[in-house]
A protein has these predicted regions:
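A short, internal acetyl-CoA/4′-phosphopantetheine-binding micro-motif in the GNAT/acyltransferase core
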Residues: 67, 86-101, 126-127
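Conserved beta-strand-loop-alpha-helix junction that forms the acyl-donor binding cleft
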Residues: 123-134
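Conserved beta-hairpin
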Residues: 62-77
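Conserved acetyl-CoA-binding loop-helix of GNAT-fold acetyltransferases
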Residues: 98-113, 134-139
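Conserved acetyl-CoA-binding loop of GNAT-fold acetyltransferases
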Residues: 138-148
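A short, well-structured alpha-helix characteristic of acyl/acetyltransferase catalytic modules
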Residues: 1-51, 161
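Active-site rim helix/loop that mediates acceptor-substrate recognition in acyltransferases
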Residues: 42-61, 70
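C-terminal "cap" of GNAT-fold acetyltransferases
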Residues: 147-161
């Protein structure tokens, strides 16, 4: 995906290659509470691990920065990857967590997947202790599709209507 996806006047998805927000992202991924929700371990990222993660995500899907407009400026607040095999989403800036922004992003990506004619979307793993994320995905119709060591996999069947 090579274009900006405008969700509303204050929220957008910026293709990863259009900006370098890795310095800000590193601060998110050094928060051990956030990393535990993402990776299941309380081990902060270093620059090398962050770069490896983004390199992997960029090769396996459409990687975006989640940006929020505040006082006329677009600020990076998280990242998300649209892939048929996984939908990792992180609102990394704590000031923007638990405000429904992840729901808006997820809704937009589900619509985009439908427009592309995809038949399903998968979430490889949500840890059992990540109740907020699981509730968010389930609210859009994702259902459990398997068990993992620390959680569950989810699946959403899409129709093109």
């Amino acid at each position: 995906m090579k274009q900006i996806i405008q969700i509303n006047s204050s929220l957008r998805l910026l293709p990863y290659f259009l900006a370098d927000h890795r310095d800000v992202a590193l601060t998110w991924y050094q928060d051990v509470d956030l990393v535990e929700l993402v990776d299941g371990v309380r081990s902060p990222y270093n620059v090398e691990k962050l770069n490896a993660m983004y390199s992997y995500l960029e090769k396996h899907g459409d990687l975006f920065w989640i940006e929020f407009r505040e006082k006329g400026e677009w600020l990076p607040i998280g990242d998300v990857t649209l892939s048929q095999e996984n939908l990792p989403i992180v609102i990394g800036n704590p000031a923007y967590q638990h405000q429904g922004l992840g729901r808006k992003v997820l809704s937009t990506l589900i619509d985009l997947a439908r427009q592309r004619g995809w038949k399903e979307l998968k979430v490889q793993e949500i840890y059992d202790f990540n109740h907020v994320s699981r509730r968010c995905f389930e609210s859009f119709g994702f259902v459990e599709s398997g068990s993992t060591e620390k959680g569950t996999s989810l699946l959403l069947k899409l129709d093109s209507n």
